Amino acid sequence: MNIPLTPIRFLQYAEQQFPGKTAVVCKDLRFTYAQFAERACRLAGALRKSGVKPGERVAFLSMNCHRLLEAYYGVLEAGAVLLPLNIRLAPHELAYILNDAGAKVLFLEKQFLEMADSFRQTLSRVQIFILLDERPQTNWLLPQNYEELLAAAAPYRADIMSFDENSTAELFYTSGTSANPKGVMLTHRNIYLHGLNVCLALHLSGDTVELHTIPLFHANGWGIAQALTFMGGTHVMLQRFDPAEVFRLIEQERVRACSLVPTMATALVNCPERGKYDLSSLERITIGGAASSPTLVREVEGKLGCSCFSGYGLTETSPMLTLSRMKSGVHWEGEQRYAGQAMTGYAVGGVEIRVVDSNDKDVPHDGKTIGEIIARSDGVMEGYWQQPEATAQAMRGGWFHTGDMATISENGYVLIVDRAKDIIVSGGENISSLDLEKTLAAHPSVYEAAVIPVPDEKWGEVPKALVVLKPDAKATEGELLEFCRSRLAHYKCPRSVEFLPSLPKTGTGKILKKELRKKYWGGQETIRPEFATKK
């Protein structure tokens, strides 16, 4: 017997097995799994009642909240495709995505009304606007808000056997660093099998209480959420990242786990209010979205009292590909353990990873030779929305090409050296900006750092460090340069250091290196050297 694989089954199972268990905590609201499932099915019924047909796109412009989590199941139950939108995008970027995806419905929070009003006349396909919270005085035609919509609808429960598991379930748009963002099509099968892998890799259970610190419209936000529902764990929603609020929720809800980007983890370990809260329930912090460092792993484990390791993946891979937990047969001690747990990690179950040269031939498993990470798994996307050429380029040879440059060791551990576009090519030598950033992070005065290439007449480009110091800390350019030279080959070290009050970041806390580079390249990065073929 073949039952279609769809994440709808995750919530159905949790409702059957854990109906009275707390499923979602959002501000002062709490929902059991029976209530969670009822609301998701009412959303499905409301969408069908509104004329939404199978395969049509339903967009959500929302911060982390219980309603967005309900959409991950209710929209799919209706047979539609969920389109979560990044709230940090500019109005013209949101308009592009809504038009490119052909969204029929847009759910949005009141705080985004003014912004959406600036582009709604340019939307070619959106027919229905629904407010997620109470209705303000507005010139918009908003006959109902979300709660009124649910109250007026009968629950709809789909016939699972009628689903095509290879049909698109969710459409996520990439950041579009060099062109318009691309829509990543994830199928019901992708999401279901990825969820099972996450359950195993992160040892999730019904006792897991997960704090959703990362927005659910991001890859490293939604991946765990789907899996946690299947296990009957508890979702705790965080609207905006604030260290004190994170600590308060950990104490109040007895949170056991959360995922962070490195800048979030850095903010937590440096928060002066940390000691005011009981963090004894916290067992695991997974760092993803950007490279970690041994220093950060050490500080998280020492100051927050929990295990800390890295996860790696992309929107196109659902997302998880690797995890840096110590695997059977590998034994690390002391600093070696911190370094290992800061690595990109080894392939999780169901994932195949290779590191290849420019001809897609495997590089030696020596932990030194640099190549590109390619992967295949049940979680790899169906393709890019209406972009067959981009899909073919990314999926050539039956493997997804990540664009991330890495080494691979004898025991299968992958270490990302850099994004291909962030590799610094100086005098024909490849220099990893991540290596430099990890080295700078070990300096006691450095809060965070970004290393970028800047033009140089002799070498083509050279590394430049942009550094934010810890509060009340002091360091000079010469001191930091000498610190790097004492730990790295001189040709790899920054040629200069600039101190900044802060670094530009995305909504999830990733450092925007593209913005930092603009000052030096004037937006003309195409003149930068290509990634060197010499390894």
Where are each of the predicted segments found?
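Structural core segment of the AMP-binding/adenylate-forming
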Residues: F10, L29, G45, K49-S50, ...
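Conserved beta-loop-beta connector loops within the AMP-binding
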Residues: G350-I374, E410-N411, A473-E477, L512
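AMP-binding/adenylate-forming catalytic core of the ANL superfamily
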Residues: L89, L106-L108, C258, S377, ...
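Conserved AMP-binding A3 loop
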Residues: T32-A34, A169-L193
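Conserved pre-ATP/AMP-binding loop-to-beta segment of ANL
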Residues: P19, L131, P136, A151-Y173, ...
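Conserved AMP-binding/adenylation subdomain of ANL enzymes
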Residues: Y192-V209, F217-A257, C271-P272
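Gly/Ser/Thr-rich phosphate-binding loop
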Residues: F230, Q252-L260, V269-A339, E352, ...
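Conserved AMP-binding/adenylate-forming core of the ANL superfamily
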Residues: I3, I8, G20-C65, L69-Y73, ...
